[in-house]
Amino acid sequence: MENSNTHFVYQQPAIEFVTVAVQLCIYLEKVAEYEREDFLDKILSILPLLYLKARLVPKSELELDGYTEQFVTEQEYEAVRQSIAAQLGSDDTYLEVYMEDMRYSDEPITAFISENIADIYQEMKDLACNYQTQNESVMNDALVACLEAFEQHWGQKLLNVLRPLHALSLSNDEWSETQYFFSSYC
């Protein structure tokens, strides 16, 4: 086992990534308390930061045999998903163009922002809870598993929801006034 000060789980990129992951979890667990505009502003700030921090963590190897513990219950997952869905209402759905299934389909595929963000939440919450064990090997393997999942699915889900969230954030009155200004100017 490495010296605690130099172990992979305590290096700056790992700590920064886990810190953003925890911030996302805390925010999503209280998302019902925010107004829609505040929700969009916050989620559009934290998701790109989470993506960046995940990309900056160097690769590591597993230290233990077996799987890391999963902490998120179905009820917790559903509570987060439903809170996000309530914030977005009918704007929760979007047409997905970057799914593997699209290559074999003539029909557009509908996806849900709330479901994709809840999937990301589950990965981040499991990571955060494994980090709380303060067992370096468990922390290491949870981080390795989370980063593998980033490459396999949640990184793409994060990028996929940014497009519709961005459009929603611009679909307010301010955007309409800006469009009017530019169309009358030219």
Indicate where each model-derived feature is located:
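N-terminal interaction modules that seed assembly of large macromolecular complexes
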Residues: 2, 8-9, 15-74
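Acidic, proline/glycine-rich low-complexity IDRs
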Residues: 3-4, 108-111, 119, 123-186
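Phenylalanine-focused residue identity feature
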Residues: 8, 17, 39, 71, ...
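Charged, amphipathic alpha-helical oligomerization/scaffolding segments
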Residues: 16-23, 42-49, 53, 79, ...
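Short glycine-rich, low-complexity/disordered patches
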Residues: 32-41, 63-66, 97-104, 138-144
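Long amphipathic alpha-helical segments
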Residues: 60-128
